[in-house]
Amino acid sequence: MRLAAASAAGLATPRFGDWDAFVSGARELVRTGTYPDRTTYFFFEAPGYPFYLAAATLGHPDDIALDKAVSAAAGAAAAPLLAWISLALFGSRRVAIATGVAGAILPSFVLFSSDVQSEALFLPLLLAAGGLLLRASDRAAERTAAKGRSAGLAVGAGAFLAVAAGAALAFAALTRPSALALAPLLLAPLADRRNAPAPRRRVAAASVIGFVLALAPWTIRNALHFGELLPVSDGLGATFFDGNSAWANRIYALKDRSEVAPMNAAMHADRVARLAALGLVPGTDAFRSPSRRSWALIHAALEDRRADPAGTRLLLLRKVWHWLRPYPTPFWGWPIVVSATVFYLALYAAAARGMMSAERRGAVRFCLAVLAISMAVHLAILVLWRYRVPYWDPILLLYGVPGAARLHRGPA
């Protein structure tokens, strides 16, 4: 289905705006064996997806059709992962299969894995992290209930799964740095009352170890290469500027697709001018510093916010609406807007019903924390509908499918 969607738009024609940054990073990896200092004028993209393109295409990332094929393959992993997590949560094969099918055909998942964009890889990594952490806690609970040799095997399996969960979250963060905000949730097993304190601590510690071991090599590489602390990339400044500068309210007020390109060009020119006013121009030591470029753009955006308190309040309201609204953008046309609105309103209702009736209350609280943290982080930085999808839509499906079944059956 994902390949069919990619073919419909043209296998050799990328549609996503940042595709060239990803491909150029992968190209430089293949050509020199090193990652470029910048993949755009302002920053270097998080390395996860470019590394994946370089490896999965066997060194041919300039082949856009092949890029789309390997992205579709990565995105397709979301469906079985959702089914696996659903089975662990609800113990029903029918619900798990239905959830997997829903994940395979959900338009947002299909769309984002049919082009050259990082969501195709980010979504399965994020799901893998959540599913592995869930299974690690379940194995620890089995250990609590077991005795003898079987208990020891459960402990070992639980620790291995926890390390893998932490590593998967680190790889997700190396693909989309916003996932760093979810790192504290690796400590969630500490609150699992099914387990004794010692197994809880082991699972939580193992997940943190896996996260650190997977993230540290890249962070150390950045420290050695730039002489600066950059956990993943220096893209925060440019993204924060987009979401908080004087341009942000204008962007969220756009109603016509034809206005987007001129607005982006004008905003790019403004960013360049603001950096130049501070002496940050290509060829200077100041510009070569990722942190200086990033912090300069953050400070510029904060100055805009301080100069316009009323606009800041309006911007926050617009961000909340753009995050929660049940359709992506009016640019897609009213038939899509109306159908997406009907679908997502129904999915919201079904997911709420599923959460209220779910027996595993700890898992519900964990998912609510993911919803809240992901929303808060993006409200502070930049809100786009495609940023919400990998964080919210899997949870909406996981609880929406059993919730819809309960709504269909009616009250017990």
Across the structure, where does each feature detected by a protein language model lie?
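Extracytoplasmic catalytic/substrate-binding loops of multi-pass membrane glycan-assembly enzymes
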Residues: 11-24, 35, 40-55, 61-65, ...
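Membrane-interface transmembrane helices that cradle and orient dolichyl/undecaprenyl
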Residues: 129-164, 190-194, 359, 407-412
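Membrane-proximal stem/loop segments at transmembrane-domain junctions that anchor or position
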Residues: 231-317
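Specific aromatic-rich, kink-prone transmembrane helix
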Residues: 81-85, 102, 121-140, 164, ...
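Transmembrane-helix motifs of polytopic, lipid-linked glycan transferases
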Residues: 69-90, 128, 132, 346-353
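Short helix- or helix-capping micro-motifs
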Residues: 1, 99-107, 111, 131, ...
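Short acidic/glycine- and proline-prone juxtamembrane loop motifs at membrane-interface regions
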Residues: 114-121
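Transmembrane-helix signature of polytopic, membrane-embedded enzymes
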Residues: 79-105, 123-124, 150, 362-367
